[in-house]
Amino acid sequence: MAEFGHLSVMPAEVLALLSPRPGGVYVDGTLGGAGHARMILEASSPDGVLVGFDRDPEALAAASKRIASFGDRVRLVRSNFAAMDESLATLGIDTIDGFLLDLGVSSHQLDTAERGFSFQVDAPLDMRMDPETGETAADLVNELSADELARIIREYGEERWAKRIASFVVKAREQHGPIESTLQLVDCVKGAIPRAAWEERIHPATRTFQALRIAVNDELGSLERGLVAGIERLAPGGRGVVISFHSLEDRIVKTVFRRYAQGCTCPKMLPRCVCGNKPRVRILTGKPVMAGGDEVATNPRARSAKVRAVEKL
């Protein structure tokens, strides 16, 4: 099994935006390899507390070892960050001074063939962040109708060939039985997309695999719920920082942040505010922060990363 290694994206930029301080309480909603978590703990020494969330038991076990030296300053929760509100209440934590969400699939999950996230190696078509619960990608591929499958691939993968891919998948499972492996699905996608339409730098199955992963793990729904929970729990002056990796995630982050920063929601035709809503956060990143060329050269995952941040008023 691959070692749970992970290069943290834009570590200096993230730390500057989160601005952890001694005595603060911070949430890392996507603990992963604990790279960002370790930096937060070091910056908030000697008594800052970190609550780390991950629904992947392998990630949680590896992270536990990597930050064990910080002792009782660490609380680990095996859960999706969308359940942050309930989990913090259980821990007796009322407010937090910051939260970080580093979205998407980790390099370890991609490199561990049996998890089924990668289209490069043959493996069971799984894609669950928590490999012990919920539907797999194979369940969706083999049970959904062509229309339902096309909708998922189109909406979550932004794939222009979604209808054709779904049609090929349904035809393949009808003729040859269930699609159970990653490369079986890759063959369907390659067959559906005309060779002339393949993009030079993107594998033809990239968007389909992204779409299924998002659907299997309810990534977009979890993101919105987690953002709301995090912002609601922030103390005045506390900060929320999010690293997204594709336009669907970034759109949700931008929308939620703007909603909390907007304040008044009255129609423009009204002469004065009657709703009474006040801005609850200040947006710290007018435009998303992007990785520099040097970082992208050493960590290609950073190429598509966008960082946005807010501060609670």
UniProtKB/Swiss-Prot annotation:
Major place of residence: cytoplasm
Reaction it catalyzes: cytidine(1402) in 16S rRNA + S-adenosyl-L-methionine = N(4)-methylcytidine(1402) in 16S rRNA + S-adenosyl-L-homocysteine + H(+)
Cross-referenced PANTHER family: 12S RRNA N4-METHYLCYTIDINE METHYLTRANSFERASE, S-ADENOSYL-METHYLTRANSFERASE MRAW
Protein name from the UniProt record: Ribosomal RNA small subunit methyltransferase H
Record carries keyword S-adenosyl-L-methionine: yes
Positions of S-adenosyl-L-methionine binding: 34-36, 54, 81, 102, 109
Organism listed in the record: Geobacter metallireducens (strain ATCC 53774 / DSM 7210 / GS-15)
GO CC entries: cytoplasm
Keywords: Cytoplasm, Methyltransferase, rRNA processing, S-adenosyl-L-methionine, Transferase
Function: Specifically methylates the N4 position of cytidine in position 1402 (C1402) of 16S rRNA.
A Gene Ontology biological process term: rRNA base methylation
Family the UniProt entry places it in: Belongs to the methyltransferase superfamily. RsmH family.
